[in-house]
Amino acid sequence: MSLEPTLRDLLHSKLQWIFVGGKGGVGKTTTSCALATLFASTPVHDAVTNTTRPRRVLLISTDPAHNLSDAFSQKFGKTPVPVNGMEETLFAMEVDPTTFTHGGFGAMLGFPGHIATDADAPSPFAALGNILKEAAGTLPGIDELSVFAEILRGVQQLSYDVVIFDTAPTGHTLRLLALPHTLNSTMEKLLSVEGLNTLIQAASAVLSSTTNLGDMSSLMPAFKQWRENVQEVQRQFTDAEKTAFICVCIPEFLSVYETERLVQELMKYDISCDSIVVNQLVLKPSSEPDCRMCNARQKIQSKYLAQIDSLYEDFHVVKMPLLSDEVRGVPALQRFAQFLLEPYDADRHGYIDVCGAAS
């Protein structure tokens, strides 16, 4: 049975983490920004005081191509900045995943100082830490996982009600989703006596046969902390009460193909996903004269819309119209967001321009 073609249910949930992902160029950033304005405009019930209060929302871009600044016509950086016009409720930041991996990797893992890859550290543990950092840095998805683990620790202290991620294109996202499971399995083996001995022998061989690694028992707490961090990320990912993934696509072959691949991977790793946003639909009022180009595009799109409706009949499938211009600034994003809550109807709503006027 088809679900309501809106994202209204999300606004009344207790979700803490929302990921918006899909193929590049399908409108992920516009969708995530519009969704963020919706959450920031919707009060949340405070169980302690039994009253409603403004909801605090953090929007984070982990896409190296960062477009949040363009979407809001405002500059963002690696720390949360209030969004103009919604200063009390909506904050945004753009982070470079590689800086988390290479700049704060030891801290993310919970390594003690003497193996945190400090260049001034006198102990040979510093060299071992560098080896571990370089080895882990080659893992696909480690950049994105580092971001999430760091944010998971920091954001919980900043009193945000919900964090929305504007993610990198599908390939990066799939690696991120798979990594906690892979790392957790690896760490289980590594933390066994045999696994740790193997690591020690390998490290000794690399550093040199004469290097004294000292008391290797101090490594155990560090690796246990790493495993706990990874396991916490995995718990958050797979908790349907806390985490949801929204797939964004357009009605074209490659986008629909990648969406199905993404949905299958989400199911594989037990990550909740029951919402799909289909952008850039050519929809015109019935009173408008025929347009040869419009009819051709509608014919192509209707083919893939039929596939989407068939594949995701138990999803919230939100169908968004192609607009007359780019969606930039809070007013335009809020106008776009209206149709995440209310199904767009060309005869009733007419053409929508970026200023929010219907014609």
From Swiss-Prot:
Gene3D superfamilies: P-loop containing nucleotide triphosphate hydrolases (3.40.50.300). One of its GO terms (cellular component) is GET complex. Keywords: ATP-binding, Cytoplasm, Endoplasmic reticulum, Hydrolase, Metal-binding, Nucleotide-binding, Transport, Zinc. It is found in: Cytoplasm; Endoplasmic reticulum. Zn(2+) binds at residues 291, 294. Belongs to the arsA ATPase family. This is ATPase ASNA1 homolog.
